[in-house]
């Protein structure tokens, strides 16, 4: 509760825009502007004895006030302060001149306030200082002159509070006694209503009985929501009788609004029966309309829907269909079962972009190249194909370009490339995720006869994006499936065929829609699951995995700034040196893309965020104060500041004044911090050497949906009956490759000195077990043929394979090495694992041009035409055999 205080002759002024602080009210404000922060620092924060500041209402426009007096700043000087030349009695000419200098309209009366709670903070990453201040209004004052002290305003004031003698004299006035009694009666009635409705009000009753009446009016009215004009009116009510009269009027108005709301609720509930419970909200709306004399809501909504349909630009045949549906809707009652479904259908027709298209700007290929280079590092071949696509669109805008399908492992930038195409074309972008879609209705929509029917994802995407010519991304197109509900991939055949998508028919829409203006782009991890007819409608662009050098550049240019921004940090708080990023790439991640790398960087950022947050400190400024709790009330400050305002429950307000500040320190990541946060390294360069430490193990290269990988093959023998066992979750093709490899080795056993005589069986009395580690991962394909032969020769000869050598290739029964796919990804995988030598089929030499030069320069690539060439290079010192090919 506000107490009587003696005001100084000058007060620092904190302006409130369109908001008034009354005596006895408590607010919480957040100061962010330069002027308000400086005022709080100099007048409140830096002073041991917290003084008073003035709260002055300010209008946000240049119009004069109809209540009270508003002032305009001017120019002048007074005792070292830059005066704003305000005098209460200024002439109209002076006001007009001041208005030209500044539009702000300052009220002539304000309220002196004291700080109950004060805290300081630092915004990250900008470093801007902010203050949160809890203020209590004390007493009214009148502004005599308004000036400047640095960036904030100061005013020469006079108090408007009555002396004790004047107050005692007023209390003897019969009119004042009558007004006091009327105010208390009305206020008590309001408190009783609130107590019945909300089970609250006991504390407020105590205030009505204990707080002096001249202070109670301000405190009571401050808790109501009222207009700025009404707030100014209360502030200007210096005379106690006028103040009580206006307060009584406001309290009575609030009481009447509560009673009207109760009347409407009672009227609605009285009309409800058990079968009408579901229409409660609709009945309440009708009752409100009846009170206002307006009961044609449904008719207005239908009319608005009709106007919206007329403005949608539908083709003539579709407009006729829509009119029939609209006439049917007008004949129905809102309670009928089909009313809502018909209305939703018509709203879809009105919302679809039939003729609304993105305004395409003239294609600038140079700008498109710069955009692609800034958003994506590397991928030169892919970028060149996109530029070619854009060049054709520039020369022939209406050309039906191919449907581009980006194929590659996760995390290499397929989706972001599609977004870059949309930006280069100047079109809106919409993404449809097809992963796991097994229902044809997801593409074509559900028929309207079903409950819960809805349009397909294509039509829904066009409705969301709002234009008929967006760039539409069909994401994860290889992840669609099929079951008894249909095949979504087959439904996409019509969508991606330029001859058919002119009149795409969605089952829910039930009218043809032109998709020919849409630019379709697709993404996939693998080509094999895509049906051949659908694959034939798209142009495949392969995105291989990134090299370590490319990952390093991507991390430094894109990932680290993005991760720091997502965690509220900057380079001033966390620094990740290039050497540490390279360490993460080599020892903590082995992937084709960069998602795992980004997750590791995010882990470092989270750890840094914890360390920075722990630097916060608290400084107590005063004692014997209770904790502040109050409901939130919106408010704003003038001069660009931000205010969060709260009205504290009425009563005695003693609060602790505390301050907080943050002092972050920069963190530099080193190897110790890496191991502490990310744990011990997951990979090391000695893995291949450890795995190939014994005979019977070889290193192969395979291709997966996640890019190239290194695959170890282990073989061992035991006493048995000459049988072969295969483990590692293998497919039929790789099992046949293992059988073929064993047959070839048995046939050449004497040539490789694995048997003393040509007719000796190397499997005599023993079994062979071949295992592919990582047994939880399915494996298949013919490219492990040379790896299997090498492992078997190593087993039988007891000669270890070189640990720095990996290989890939299919072999025939006659020992020829056939070409395989995924050469670039496989070489990149070998580079990631620290492999120094790679054996490839000779006919794959043409694929080496796609491998980055930096990777090729760090590897020794050996081309093999026959299996003998592979074995010669797989073992240290070569693999001796007889120079006899008579069995070939």
UniProtKB/Swiss-Prot annotation:
User: Which Pfam family is one of this chain's hits?
Assistant: Lon_C
NCBIfam families for the chain: lon
EC identifiers of the protein: 3.4.21.53
Q: Which GO CC annotations does the UniProt entry carry?
A: intracellular organelle lumen; peroxisomal matrix; peroxisome
Motif Microbody targeting signal, residue numbers: 886-888
Name of the protein in question: Lon protease homolog 2, peroxisomal
Mind listing the GO biological process terms from this record? lateral root development; protein import into peroxisome matrix, docking; protein processing; protein quality control for misfolded or incompletely synthesized proteins
Q: What class of enzyme is it?
A: hydrolase
Q: Where does ATP bind?
A: 408-415
Location of the Lon N-terminal domain: 11-255
User: The Lon proteolytic domain covers which part of the protein?
Assistant: 692-877
List the active site: 783, 826
Purpose of the protein? ATP-dependent serine protease that mediates the selective degradation of misfolded and unassembled polypeptides in the peroxisomal matrix. Necessary for type 2 peroxisome targeting signal (PTS2)-containing protein processing and facilitates peroxisome matrix protein import.
Q: Which family does it belong to?
A: Belongs to the peptidase S16 family.
Q: Where are the transmembrane segments?
A: none
Q: Which InterPro entries match?
A: AAA+_ATPase (IPR003593), ATPase_AAA_core (IPR003959), Lon_bac/euk-typ (IPR004815), Lon_lid (IPR054594), Lon_proteolytic (IPR008269), Lon_Prtase (IPR027065), Lon_prtase_N (IPR003111), Lon_prtase_N_sf (IPR046336)
Compartment(s): Peroxisome matrix
Catalysed transformations (reactions): Hydrolysis of proteins in presence of ATP
Q: Which GO terms describe its molecular function?
A: ATP binding; ATP hydrolysis activity; ATP-dependent peptidase activity; serine-type endopeptidase activity
Q: What UniProt keywords apply to this chain's record, in alphabetical order?
A: ATP-binding, Hydrolase, Nucleotide-binding, Peroxisome, Protease, Serine protease
